A protein has these predicted regions:
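Acidic, mature catalytic/reactive cores of soluble proteins
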Residues: 1-158
Length: 158
């Protein structure tokens, strides 16, 4: 929905992301839904680290190789992605006043993150599962830069 896909197709994609991926302050890397075809995550020895039919991993914690790495792209919520979702939302609805208001509200869901962890900064990732604990780097530059970039887009006409 950032210009490559427009109209109703873009609106359907944004709505699906809204339903399954968006959490307060971030966007999950994978929805907590069954997948087809199966998506197996294995150890170097070939052992399964997940359920291939339901690969969602909602918590980014534990051992680096057997817990955090598999979770990173299978359910962990990325803070830097939420501003792009907000931009896609307003572009899918041609910057209607309602879409700008909604996008600002989503972007403001990042505000509590500024008051936790490394104060005044945005983290790298959150758990995909509630209560969406902050994880990874406490002060992630591209989380902040994306939030600022999109905030400017949403407020350029004021």
């Amino acid at each position: 929905a950032l210009g490559e896909v427009t109209g109703e197709s873009a609106r359907r994609m944004v709505a699906a992301a809204q339903r399954h991926l968006v959490v307060p302050g971030a966007v999950r890397s994978l929805a907590p839904l069954p997948v087809v075809p199966p998506l197996a995550v294995r150890t170097d020895d070939g052992d399964f680290l997940n359920n291939p039919n339901e690969p969602y991993w909602g918590r980014y914690e534990g051992d680096e190789d057997t817990r955090r790495k598999p979770a990173y792209h299978n359910g962990t919520a990325w803070v830097w992605s939420l501003p792009m979702f907000c931009e896609a939302l307003v572009r899918a609805w041609d910057f209607s006043p309602e879409s700008v208001t909604a996008a600002r509200s989503y972007l403001l869901s990042m505000e509590p993150l500024l008051n936790e962890g490394c104060l005044g900064h945005l983290p790298e990732v959150l758990d995909g599962d509630a209560p969406h604990a902050q994880r990874g780097c406490d002060a992630q530059a591209w989380s902040v830069s994306e939030a600022y970039r999109v905030w400017k887009i949403l407020n350029c006409n004021e």
